[in-house]
Design a protein with these regions (language model features):
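Acidic/proline-rich low-complexity IDRs
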Residues: 11-15, 41, 109
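Exposed beta-strand-loop-beta-strand "reactive/processing" segments of non-cytosolic proteins
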Residues: 50-85
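Short, Lys/Arg-rich N-terminal segment immediately upstream of the first membrane anchor
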Residues: 1-6
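Structured, soluble extracytoplasmic/luminal domains of envelope-associated proteins
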Residues: 78-117
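Short, non-transmembrane alpha-helical segments in secretory-pathway proteins
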Residues: 24-53
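N-terminal low-complexity, charged segments
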Residues: 46-52, 57, 66, 94-96, ...
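Compositionally biased, intrinsically disordered low-complexity regions
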Residues: 7, 20, 60-63, 102, ...
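Hydrophobic membrane-insertion alpha-helices, especially the h-region
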Residues: 8-25
Length: 117
């Protein structure tokens, strides 16, 4: 009888750990996948080189669920948001940092802004 109780507790623990860990792993994996899709798109389709990119980070949002924030070295005060789903990768927004706004950066000054047409 005692063995069945112990087995049940171990099984319950495994299930609970799985419920917590699996979503975390899936989220991190998707962020990594999206980051790589955007990086590949920028380098292979848009002609950037790795050195042009200051940072690239996969994010979890609401809509779109996963997106990527890219900062280019020639515009460190602007964050560009990219969507990457299946084979579709496109820039859907940008954000000028507080520092960039203090410097007076406006949309017409953006060097890497490429809205989807």
């Amino acid at each position: 009888m005692w063995k069945k109780g112990k087995t049940f507790k171990v099984a319950l623990l495994v299930i609970l750990v799985g419920i917590v860990i699996v979503p975390i792993v899936l989220i991190q994996a998707n962020k990594y996948i999206y980051k790589n899709r955007v990086s590949t798109y920028l380098i292979e389709k848009k002609g950037f080189v790795k050195e042009d990119i200051e940072s690239i980070e996969g994010k979890l949002g609401s809509l779109p669920t996963f997106y990527v924030i890219v900062t280019f070295k020639n515009e460190p005060d602007v964050k560009y948001m990219y969507f990457a789903h299946d084979n579709n990768v496109f820039q859907f927004d940008y954000q000028i940092t507080d520092e960039g706004q203090r410097e007076g950066i406006k949309e017409e000054d953006l060097k890497n802004y490429n809205p989807r047409s």
